[in-house]
Amino acid sequence: MEEFQGYLELYRSQQHDFLYPLIFREYIYALAHDRGLNRSVLLDNVGYDKKSSLLIIKRLISRMYQQNHFIISLNDSNQNKFFGYNKNLYSQMISEGFAVIVEIPFSLRLVSSLEETETVKSYNLRSIHSIFPFFEDKFPHLNYASDVLIPYPIHLEILVQTLRYCVKDPSSLHLLRLFLHEYYNWNTLITPKKSIFAKSNQRLFLLLYNSYVCEYESILLFLRNQSNHLRLTSSGILFERIRFYEKIKYPVEEIFANDFPATLWFFKDPFIQYVRYQGKSILASKDTPLLMNKWKYYLVHFWQCHFYVWSQPGRIHINQLSKHSFDFLGYLSSIRPNISVVRSQLLENSFLMDNAMKKLDTLFPIIPMIGSLAKVKFCNTSGHPISKSSWADSSDSDIIDRFVRIGGNLSHYYSGSSKKKSLYRIKYILRLSCVKTLARKHKSTVRTFLKRLGPKLLDEFFTEEEQIFSLLFPRTSSTLKRFYRGRIWYLDILCINDLVNHE
């Protein structure tokens, strides 16, 4: 009955947007702890042990309200703000619990939007690889792409203000301000170099940052959709000249703020495409470089005027797709012409026709990847494999499993590469590094160790897909060769794991 009463209280809070009472409910923190365990890839959970107490959390929240935040002295660093308790544990508990509560309005909006549009829930659309089929379909018809780095807000108040449109509970927002202020002071006194985006509180700040990006993209999408409804008029020729003289007299932001129809006309482009992953986005268009420069300077002024975030135009790079490649999601992508010769027969005359088509080319970044392998001591900066000395104390099966897992993840993620030769080189580095690590552990040479184990050791590095293809088709068949050369996009990749995570 108590569990039913708790969920009933949760439902009533959702209906009236009263999120503040949920902060003092223990099942919220238990739910946050369970989510932390299920999302161990993103978070390193510090534990919901027996020493944790909801009473201590209430005392901490009360103390945040009682403190005078206008008086901050250096002597505060010597004071124990948590009465002798583990402040890292309880700061993470409060942040994770608050993140679960604030996610409630976003979840309700998502469910209602799916029900209204009758959208089929497809988890395949969450895959990172689902972006590249979109590139293959749209980008060959475009000419220019802007590489945009979304700036981070300098002041935390900007992040709180972006939540006002979804979270309509003033008490919750006020408590969030106090917590951010308090936690920001802890981090500046304890770990000043790591800033506020610490690993232990990643969930809350990811939520705040995503709300900030969502606000930015909603305005950008509104301008994009509204500009498509504008029609050509006879005064369109005079628009550029009028805007030129107004820019001389007034700042650009005043023009955008006072003349909204002109702003929409300013960005009339039916071929604009926008893609984002985390803090990096691609803005591509079929139009001229002039329009891309308009978007570039508008984004800079938009961030400065609306979010009070300073951004330099140099953070936005405009490249021609046919001449330059852009780095996105670990791939070097570019548009290259694919010329095919077609023989045509017309009565007694025959002639050849060159059919030129543009194709998306996705390359494996061999040089950055060698740098990453050298950073974690799999090879040197020249790409020569070396032994992993820190793993030499592990068992043979554990060492082999670690190397096989890293090689399998790289093969799985970079299966969409147009040219697999660079990927095979990386796998060769991992194989030889594994052999050298095992030889170092057994105090033997590489040649002697390979003779003792035979080729079975290297067979461990074949991925599951390669083993299935080798069973279905003979290794000499042309079908298997096409599979090796062709691009394969997987719809089960939800995040990019860094090599350091395998330490």
From Swiss-Prot:
Gene Ontology annotations of biological process type: mRNA processing; RNA splicing; tRNA processing
One Pfam family named in its UniProt record: MatK_N
Any one Gene Ontology cellular component term annotated for this protein: chloroplast
MF terms (GO), sorted A to Z: RNA binding
InterPro entries assigned to the protein according to its UniProt record, in alphabetical order: Domain_X, Maturase_MatK, Maturase_MatK_N
Major subcellular location class: plastid
Subcellular location(s) per record: Plastid, Chloroplast
Family: Belongs to the intron maturase 2 family. MatK subfamily.
Its job: Usually encoded in the trnK tRNA gene intron. Probably assists in splicing its own and other chloroplast group II introns.
Protein name: Maturase K
Source organism per UniProt: Rosa multiflora (Multiflora rose)
Gene: matK
